[in-house]
A protein has these predicted regions:
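Structured core elements
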Residues: 10-12, 22, 88, 120, ...
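Hard-cation-handling environments
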Residues: 33-110
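Feature captures C-terminal
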Residues: 74, 85, 94-229
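Residues that form or immediately flank small-molecule/cofactor binding pockets and catalytic motifs
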Residues: 1-2, 28, 92-94, 192
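Active-site-adjacent helix-turn-beta-strand microarchitecture at beta-sheet edges
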Residues: 1-53
Length: 229
């Protein structure tokens, strides 16, 4: 699944019927050849050129270096505004570095390297409470777990963070008040929450996947519209 093995399947067929099947998983490290110096130099040059071009693409001047919590809050706010959603639910493992004072696309590539888009769903207060109960409970188990696949390019899941609402002691708070069970909200998440097996309550909902922007591209749009030049 992660490129560690090659799959080899040998089928024996007689008269249109399969009579034997042999399956083998072969470690890719047994087949990887050492790169020669010319290949290594080419790869390094392409990587550096890509970073140089992204670094030239100025996004915003925040005036100062943000700390980690401030960077998280910026991402939460950006996601809500750029997807026209009321609420958002993310995890700190998505944010790989802090931002500011100058922000370029190279900074956003490093801070939010994930190949993830956003998923939006409409929920009642009761449904949101069920989602939060599941996500916050699972997050305690996932907090320090290495996550791979589904576009995630970070290390661990981290902690759950919420945008425009709070989940405390089993209650939802929105605009400094307890949410009614029948209230309706638009909630936006990274698509990983929908595709993964961690959160079956989310997979059961009708979800709209938002194209074409990746997470970092939404943040770039927000900063261009709201950040100082």
């Amino acid at each position: 699944r992660y490129g560690y093995f090659l799959g080899c399947i040998d089928l024996t067929v007689e008269n249109g019927q399969m009579i034997a099947c042999q399956i083998e998983a072969i470690p890719t490290k047994d087949y990887i050849l050492d790169l020669d110096k010319e290949d290594e130099a080419f790869i390094k040059a392409m990587r550096e050129e890509g970073h140089r071009r992204l670094a030239q693409e100025k996004v915003a001047n925040l005036g100062r270096k943000l700390n980690f919590n401030e960077t998280c809050q910026l991402v939460l706010q950006a996601v809500c505004q750029e997807t026209d959603s009321q609420l958002t639910l993310l995890n700190t493992g998505l944010i790989m570095k802090t931002l500011g004072p100058q922000v370029t696309m190279a900074d956003l590539q490093e801070a939010l390297p994930h190949q993830m888009r956003m998923a939006r769903l409409f929920v009642t207060g009761q449904e949101l409470k069920e989602i939060c109960r599941e996500v916050f409970t699972k997050a305690e188990l996932l907090k320090n777990q290495a996550i791979k696949g589904m576009g995630f390019r970070g290390k661990t899941f981290g902690e759950v963070i919420t945008g425009n609402f709070a989940y405390k002691n089993g209650n939802l708070l929105y605009n400094s008040r307890v949410v009614d069970s029948n209230e309706k909200f638009s909630l936006v998440l990274v698509d990983q929450y929908y595709f993964s097996s961690y959160f079956p309550t989310i997979k059961e909902k009708e979800v709209t996947l938002l194209f074409p922007d990746l997470l970092r591209e939404l943040v770039a749009k927000y900063l261009r519209n709201n950040g100082a030049d």
